[in-house]
């Protein structure tokens, strides 16, 4: 599994609860740009429309060698999941008021996949706790060295 794009803010801003691996509909120039490691998931989120999942604000910059056949960098991308997985996600999202966020984009068996999470947003004090735990862990690791 080769990770192409990562969302570093996902663990910081959300309590990650349940993950799903989804396929994604891309154009050729988008695949080429992603294989070069270009792309950003920082502001990306998943929304539901007509019982289908879509990924919005996943920016992939234009591929330099594509010429006039290039893609729009802010295009909405469709996610591919089984029907029962989509129903599960929609039900949990509505019942528990969860967000659906992407955490990483990767290659698996020659196909590009997106790892999405059902997540609950953290409050400000939760973020502070996360920072405190991280600094304590770093200090302990520094002492053992």
From Swiss-Prot:
GO CC terms in record: cytosol
Compartments, as annotated in UniProt: Cytoplasm
Top-level division of the source organism's lineage: Bacteria
Record's protein name: SsrA-binding protein
Null mutant phenotype: Essential, it cannot be deleted.
Residues in the signal sequence: none
Keyword RNA-binding attached: yes
NCBIfam families: PRK05422.1, smpB
Entry function: Required for rescue of stalled ribosomes mediated by trans-translation. Binds to transfer-messenger RNA (tmRNA), required for stable association of tmRNA with ribosomes. tmRNA and SmpB together mimic tRNA shape, replacing the anticodon stem-loop with SmpB. tmRNA is encoded by the ssrA gene; the 2 termini fold to resemble tRNA(Ala) and it encodes a 'tag peptide', a short internal open reading frame. During trans-translation Ala-aminoacylated tmRNA acts like a tRNA, entering the A-site of stalled ribosomes, displacing the stalled mRNA.
Entry keywords, A to Z: Cytoplasm, RNA-binding
An example Gene Ontology biological process: trans-translation
Family assignment from sequence similarity: Belongs to the SmpB family.
Keyword Cytoplasm annotated: yes
InterPro entries: SmpB (IPR023620), SsrA-bd_prot (IPR000037), SsrA-bd_prot_CS (IPR020081)
GO molecular function list: RNA binding
Gene name of this polypeptide: smpB
Stored SUPFAM superfamilies: Small protein B (SmpB)
